[in-house]
Structures are given as C-alpha cells and as structure tokens.
From Swiss-Prot:
Residues 286-295 have a biased composition (Pro residues). Residues 212-223, 253-264 have a biased composition (Gly residues). It holds the Pfam family CCM2_C. Belongs to the CCM2 family. Gene3D superfamilies: 1.20.1160.20, Pleckstrin-homology domain (PH domain)/Phosphotyrosine-binding domain (PTB) (2.30.29.30). This is Cerebral cavernous malformations 2 protein-like.
Amino acid sequence: MEYEVKKGKKGFVSPIRRLVFPKAGRRAACRSSVSRRPLHSMPLYPPDYLIDPQILLCDYLEKEVKFLGHLTWVTSSLNPSSRDELLQLLDTARQLKELPLKTTAEQDSILSLSARCLLLTWRDNEELILRIPTHEIAAASYLQDDALHLLVLKTGLGVDPVPAGVDASPGGAGRDPGPPGGAPEKRRVGTAERRHTICSLDWRMGWGGGAAEARAGGGGGGSLERQRAGARASGSWERRQTFSGSWERRHGGGGGGGGAGKPGGSWERRQAGSGGGGSWERRHPGPNPLDPQDPSPDAYCNLVILAVANRDAAEESCALICQVFQIIYGDQSIECVDRAGYHYTSTPERPWLCSRSESCHTDGTYAYDADFSCCSSFNGSQDTFEACYSGTSTPSFHGSHCSGSDHSSLGLEQLQDYMVTLRSKLGPLEIQQFAMLLREYRLGLPIQDYCTGLLKLYGDRRKFLLLGMRPFIPDQDIGYFEGFLEGVGIREGGILTDSFGRIKRSMSSTSASAVRSYDGAAQRPEAQAFHRLLADITHDIEALAPDDDDDDEDEPRGSRGGSDAAEDNYL
C-alpha cells in the first residue's frame, strides 16, 4: 500500500529517472531560459508589401523562418513555378534524409534581407548558416505542401552550405568558444550590419572590381568567420577565384583546393571523406539520385528550403526579394547605359503589383524569377531586368507576360513613322535632348515643363512635331497636352496633320502608371505594352545619335539650312 501511495503522488520525479533521462529536462529548461531579441523589421501591408528602396539599400529587414535544408546540385532546368516538380524533388529529398520530415524549434532561423544579399542565421545563437549574394539568386518560389508553407530559393552553385567553416547546427563545434573562463558570447553589436557590408564587398568583387585586393589578402575574404577558419575559403566568390571549384576538383585532378583540408559543399564532403558519408550513403552503396549526372557544373543549381508561418509571410518575403531584384538589376542597367555613352534607360517595371484576384493560383505555386543578362543593347531593357510574377507553371520567362500583339503592331507603325520624321528634322544633339526630356517626363517631370521644353527644342518652324507625341501621352495629361497644342496653333486637321493624321490614340485605357511606373497602381496588359513601346522609342532615338554624329562631323553647320529646306518641302 505504501508503494501504491508513493506511486500515486503527482509532481514527484525519481532520481533514477532523472539520471537516466537527463536530456529532456535540460532541453526544456534551456529552451525556456533562452531570450530571443525582437527582429529588426517593420510592418508591410498586402497585397504589394511595398517598402522604401532606401531601406533595402542602406538597411535590412529580418523575417523569422525555419531552415529545413540546402539541396545542392539540383538540375537547373527545374521550374520553380511548377508545383509538381518541386513536390517531387522535396519528396525525394525527404526519402534520402536530406530534408526533415517535420519542423522543430531547433530549425528556427532569421532571414535577413537587404539589396546586396540575403543572410540566414540561427534564431537563438545567430550563427551564420548561409550568405546568399543577390546575383546568386535565380528565383524565389512559394509552395504549400499540406500544412507546410515553404519558401524555396533557387541559387547558383557558388552559395556554400556552411560558409567560413562555421558549424551549421546551433551550438555546433565550429563556434568560437571565446576566452577560457569567460561568459558565453553574446550577439555582437552590428553583426548583421557587418555581414551585409561584407557581402556588398564580395558582390562588387564578384563583378571584377576587387579581385586583386582579394588575392593580395590571401584569398580568405574579409569576414570574421573566414579569418577564423584560416586556410579554407568557402565564400562563393573567394572559392571560385582562389581555388578551383568543387566540380573541377572532382573531374580535373583535384585543382588547387585539395590541400585546404575540407572539401566544398555537402556532396563534395560525402565524396571526399571515407567515413563522413550521409545517412543515405551509409545505407546504400550506390550513387545518390540527387547527385549530378551530367559532367557540367553549369547544368546545376542549389535550392534553399525554408518554412514560414503562413501564406502571407511567404508572399511578403517573395515581394521583398522581387523588389531587391528591381533595385539591383535596375541600377545595373542604368550604369551600363551610362557607360555606353547614352543618357537614358527605361524605368524598371513592377509587375508584381498585382492583386490576388487578378492572378490565378490554380496550382498553389508562384515564383519570382530574375532573368539577368548584362547586354550591350538595351532594346526592351525592362524585359531584361524585370522580375516575373507567374500564377501557373511558366515554361518561358518572357512567355508569362500578357500578349499585346495588336497594340505592338500598331505601335510599331507609329514608332517607325515618328523615327523617320525625327531623323529628318532633328540633329544628333537635339535627338539626345529629346531623349533626356522624355526620360525626365517619365520620372516625374510635370507635363507643363515637358511641353515647354519640347516647344523650345523644336522651335516655331518644327512645332508640328508635337502632334506626333499625342499617342504617347498618358490619360491624366492628355487634356493639358491637347490644350497646349491648340494654344501654340496646332490643330488636328489641315496641312499640319498630314504627317501624323493617321495616328490615333489607340491606347485610351492606358494609365499614367505605364509611363511613370513607380506609383502604386497595378499595370494592365495595355499599360505594359505601352510602357514597352515608350522604351523602344527612346532606345531607337538614342541609336540614331552615333550615326548622326558622323554625319554632323562631315557636314558643317550649313546642313542646318538644308534641314530647314527639307521642312519646307515636308510641309
């Protein structure tokens, strides 16, 4: 009876049980004692989740996620917008124990976003898991798998699973214990800022701006973790520049990184180490189905799998990444055009400004792709550097846009007519001034100043050219523009209309956001077609300038008189 009474007491824990099973109690106590700092964030509102670009350029935002895994050497043909492809890959990874079957508190992480990079750190000790430069991100996708809301980042092979030799697990052996006998190391002030700054330097070096400095410093990069790691250079840019890549080490005789002690990513560690194989390799001696089959590193990519709280959190993260794409790639396009000697490039679109009702989510998956290619000719540059919002599986990046063939064919005819007229009426410098005026107007110049500048540029003898700009004025300014034409003596009808009389306003439904794309309104297909038409106009106008420069050098200023004579014949 006494035994039964003792057994029935509540709250009593046997000392033997406490000695045999100490982990559960310690783990619960440890979890309860850990205090997590508030995230460095700000509220954003659906459906657009717009943020001031200066915050992403000069600061960063933090979002709480769960880090599920980092899949390396995934075929690059994987469509991030395809729900079936992603689910099949995730199921295969779970079967191979590459991804966990369920989420736990130990997977809590912080996703830190800035214009230069994405940082992934553990939530408790804030050890760095991944540093992903923006130029390494190919796409960001949202996928709902049963009760899980997954955020999938498709990146290049240059992103290392464990950067700078730090252990990827919380409390891992790779942490720096600090001075002996000292207190546990707390979060350093400015850690996230330092990491974002370092990645900004690595990002500039990756484009060829600092290779000499990196090699002079020993090839170890500038981060604190990389200095602690010593010989191993596992940063994405540093490893490619200093040592040969993992694929070259396996197929080219070891390269220059074989003496570094640790091989590269997870697949390389499994191949190089005799006893360090993963769980799947210990159970199966054959090849891993997730390992590369085609001997070409360009045919593969990496996937970072994150879990978020709900759909809104996933949409917010995708929208932020999409805005990062716009900031970085839009700035690069402007810099490339400036280096080429031009004075204009089209303002990047924001096609993610779409409400949920306007987009179909039949498969529950959508992706934001960054199809980046730095080209010398910026014909349709807003298509080159824009981020794509696709509601269904899109086999082609550009194919996801709405088709505007009817408007494009009519716009092409209008464009050709206007280009022929401008070539015969304006000199090279005047064409460049026209392009600058059009750029300023699209960036917010009032219609009054724009019309005054055009009239001053054309002069009284060529003011009829203003009539040709009528199809390219948005609805909110068309009233003032027509009144301005009547005020300077240009009326529709009569001899002045012979040049542009057949040009009608075919895009009456086009909103002002098609010309000034940085307002908060969603763009319809007609607005996007109108925006592309304006970009083609300015591109072709600038393309005329180099040819006319040669003609201007050969012909003295007396050619201006010939132009006036041509105007008389034209009229």
